[in-house]
């Protein structure tokens, strides 16, 4: 049995998502819910952020948008922190 990863959004990420056009928002939500949550290793589809304070965060590219996430292995949770264009 494969456990699905839980996708959660910070309040600021939700606000950023609401500011996007509907098509972009749906594309991001679909990507996170259908692709990332079903992966055995969500890191396989992303890139680690590099820098002294950024080593714990991962980035996904969806079209022209960048999704910044914290992958929490102990809870099988991908926390979306920021959505940038």
Say what each PLM segment does.
Residues 34-59:
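A short, surface-exposed loop/turn module that caps and links secondary-structure elements
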Residues 19-22, 36-37:
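Residues in soluble alpha-helical coiled-coils and helical-bundle/repeat scaffolds
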Residues 1-6, 11, 15-19, 26, ...:
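Enriched for short, Lys/Arg-rich terminal
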